[in-house]
Design a protein with these regions (language model features):
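Gly-rich Lys/Arg/Thr-decorated short loops/hinges at beta-loop-alpha junctions or inter-strand turns
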Residues: 22-29, 80-92, 186-188, 231-236
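Ferredoxin-type iron-sulfur electron-transfer modules in oxidoreductases and energy-metabolism complexes
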Residues: 29-45, 73-76, 82, 91-95, ...
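Short acidic, glycine/serine/threonine-rich loops at helix termini
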Residues: 57, 63-65, 89-92, 131-136, ...
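Cofactor-/ligand-binding subdomain signature composed of acidic, glycine-rich
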Residues: 1-43
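Histidine-anchored nucleotide/phosphate-binding helix
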Residues: 99-113
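Conserved phosphate/anionic-ligand binding catalytic regions in large, soluble enzymes, centered on
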Residues: 47-68, 156-168, 325-337, 373-385
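Hydrophobic alpha-helical positions that pack around
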Residues: 128-246, 257-261
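Short loop-to-beta-strand transition segments
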Residues: 64, 119, 259-272
Length: 415
């Protein structure tokens, strides 16, 4: 066993261009999974590390495990969330496809820590390589664990990975999210207390169990410790998934992906539930959840989307809004009618076909829709839309008044 390179932890090991890491290679590289006599020790280590959930919400992992462990006794269920329905993210599928045993390690540790007798691996069915790799890894590990383990392919859809949607799907076959109590941690799969954790969070828990919280905190900048998986897309010569120290600036991440500030007009951070930022505001900003929040931006699931200077931000936002409208769970008016209306209005502005009142309507809907839906889907969409109106405000006005795009010079945005 050897300690991973400081800058490469989750993705340390064989190249990410071949087959999944085999169990024997995984054990040779990292050693056997520790079996602590007191599983609360692991929870304390997770708390001391400061590890945050990597599925988007950013809740402290150790605190989440402790809350469940203190009120269950062998009756809980662990759900490994690998649905990854966010189009701009690829980190989870990469981790599952190439480091499946690290994910299984984390799931086993979580089950032992919270007193679970069942582990469900919930993997997006469209991620075929991840489904295959996780299926093989689970089969290889069944004999060593006391928990029942099963793989369930999640339906294709943006909301399918939301906690309540995942639990509803596992219980009834309907991936429908809700904000209605009880929480899944109280009444989840089979009506039992359920720990639902993102695959990256679990993989990191497996490393912390081996190397300790001090090791985890030995890298990172400012007050942020550890590393994170980031998906970079857009104006990048080398787009894809990379592992970086928390606190690394957006500009440094972009440089590693092969681009420079003059090639980038704006940055979308955190994905389709995230926020747009002007390149001048984002470039020196550290990838730090607290710092980003203080600037009104989102870390989310680690997405850095670089909008090229030749692309229209209005049109790109319209495409995202149209997608979010089609991904509605169809259970409330703000989502079904509100997102559809705002998507259509944004598209008319982008296409140079606005009738004169679209911008006012969009601004009004952005303020009215949040908090009124049956789940958080419309809230996330409106957060992105609100940031687009701020970052691309002048371009929205230009489109609406002239019917043309100042970026492409075309009528609307054709490119």
């Amino acid at each position: 066993m050897h300690t991973p390179d400081p800058a490469q932890r989750l993705l340390a090991g064989p190249p990410l261009d071949g087959n999944p890491e085999r169990l024997d290679a995984h054990l040779t590289r990292l050693g056997a999974l520790p079996c602590a006599d007191n599983h609360l020790d692991l929870i304390s280590s997770l708390e001391a590390s400061g590890l945050l959930g990597r599925g988007g919400a950013g809740f402290p992992v150790g605190r989440k495990w402790r809350a469940l462990a203190e009120r269950t006794s062998g009756t809980a269920v662990v759900v490994v969330n690998g649905a990854e329905g966010e189009p701009a993210s690829a980190k989870d599928r990469i981790l599952m496809a190439y480091r499946p045993h690290l994910v299984v390690d984390g799931a086993i540790l979580a089950a032992e820590a919270v007193g679970a007798d069942e582990i469900v691996f919930y993997v997006g069915r469209e991620h075929e390589a991840a489904v295959a790799a996780m299926g093989r890894a689970i089969d290889e590990r069944r004999a060593e664990v006391r928990q029942a383990m099963r793989l369930v392919t999640a339906p294709v859809g943006y909301v399918a990975g939301e906690a309540s949607a995942a639990v509803h799907y596992l219980n009834s076959g309907d991936a429908r999210p809700t904000t209605t109590p009880p929480r899944v941690s109280t009444r989840g799969v089979h009506g039992r207390p359920t720990l639902l954790q993102n695959v990256e969070s679990l993989a990191y828990a497996a490393l912390i169990a081996r190397f300790g919280d001090r090791w985890y905190r030995s890298v990172g900048r400012l007050d942020s410790r550890g590393t994170a998986l980031i998906t970079v897309s857009g104006a990048a010569r080398r787009p894809g998934v990379m592992e970086v120290e928390l606190g690394t600036t957006i500009g440094e991440i972009a440089a590693a992906a092969g681009t420079t500030a003059p090639r980038v007009q704006a940055v979308v951070l955190g994905g389709y539930f995230g926020t747009w930022a002007r390149v001048g505001d984002a470039w020196r900003l550290p990838l730090d959840p607290d710092v980003m929040k203080a600037h009104g931006l989102t870390f989310g699931c680690g997405i850095v989307g670089l909008l090229p200077t030749e692309r229209c931000g209005v049109s790109t936002t319209a495409e995202i809004m149209a997608f979010m409208a089609t991904e509605s769970a169809g259970q409330c008016g703000p989502c079904v009618f509100g997102l559809r209306a705002i998507g259509a209005a944004t598209r008319r502005v982008a296409n140079g076909a606005a009738g004169g009142g679209e911008l006012g309507d969009i601004e009004r809907w952005v303020s009215q829709i949040p908090g009124r839906g049956a789940c958080r889907h419309p809230d996330g969409a409106m957060q992105l839309m609100a940031s687009a109106l701020e970052v691309f405000g002048d371009e929205f006005i230009y489109h609406a008044r002239t019917g043309r795009c100042s970026i492409t010079g075309s009528r609307g945005e054709a490119a």
